[in-house]
Amino acid sequence: MAQVIKRKPTSPGRRFVVSIVDKELHKGASYAPLTQSKNRISGRNNVGRITTRHKGGGHKRRYRIIDFKRNKDDITARVERLEYDPNRSANIALVLYTDGERRYIIAPHGLSVGYTIVSGNSVAIQAGNVMPLSNIPLGGVVHCIELKPMKGAQIARSAGAFAQLIAKEGNYVTLRLRSGEVRKVLADCRATIGEVSRSEHSLKKLGKAGATRWRGVRPTVRGVVMNPVDHPHGGGEGKTSGGRHPVSPWGTPTKGYKTRSNKRTDKLILRHRNKG
């Protein structure tokens, strides 16, 4: 079980730090055959222009190849170890199948070393097992949910995430997501039982700007302190408030303006998510 630790203020940079410490995590290196190099492009495109702002720098990482499909049916796997993954907020687990293959999976809450998991159409309802949504009882809590059968998990993959199955009707089941959104998903899609590990992640505080830079995130500059050539809010004599409703650098209204436009899947969303 992870612990939330508030650090002693031995320096200005440590004063506001709140850390998440999990003593069950593996202390050594990751499993090399399931990792690959990850090149940073710092938000630039092929001609070197910035296409995504506020990216650059940060500690070098290796990508862990995660099994989001969980398609080895009716073959049990034993959890060898739990690991930290720098590429996501949740912990990951290295599992060993009885046929000798190893895979990384998103670690659900409550999973420990030595536990046995399995995927299939009719498996036990326990954390880490995978089955079609049609076979999961109403009220069940799931994560790593597919949107298309056998495409791999796309929903509820971050730390502490989960969805609750609240209805079944025809070829679809209805899920209530943690954001408050209620949507339909094909009943043949698979999901993992339980919620994602490391639910304490939301309590973590980095404590200083440098810790954000270690993660490859650069500062965000306000538009009102820029020049008119750089932002619609820029310019003016002395300090100004921008003089117009908030917009992005490209003139799109922001701070609450809806930009989602996907009519193809709107029919599957019964209630949109709560405002953040």
UniProtKB/Swiss-Prot annotation:
One of its GO terms (molecular function) is structural constituent of ribosome. Residues 224-276 are annotated as: Disordered. Disulfide bonds: none annotated. The keyword Kinase does not apply. One of the primary rRNA binding proteins. Required for association of the 30S and 50S subunits to form the 70S ribosome, for tRNA binding and peptide bond formation. It has been suggested to have peptidyltransferase activity; this is somewhat controversial. Makes several contacts with the 16S rRNA in the 70S ribosome. One of its GO terms (biological process) is cytoplasmic translation. One of its GO terms (cellular component) is large ribosomal subunit. PANTHER family: LARGE RIBOSOMAL SUBUNIT PROTEIN UL2M, RIBOSOMAL PROTEIN L2. InterPro entries: NA-bd_OB-fold, Rib_uL2_dom2, Ribosomal_uL2, Ribosomal_uL2_bac/org-type, Ribosomal_uL2_C, Ribosomal_uL2_CS, Ribosomal_uL2_dom3, Ribosomal_uL2_RNA-bd_dom. Pfam families: Ribosomal_L2, Ribosomal_L2_C. Belongs to the universal ribosomal protein uL2 family. This is Large ribosomal subunit protein uL2. Keywords: Ribonucleoprotein, Ribosomal protein, RNA-binding, rRNA-binding. Part of the 50S ribosomal subunit. Forms a bridge to the 30S subunit in the 70S ribosome.
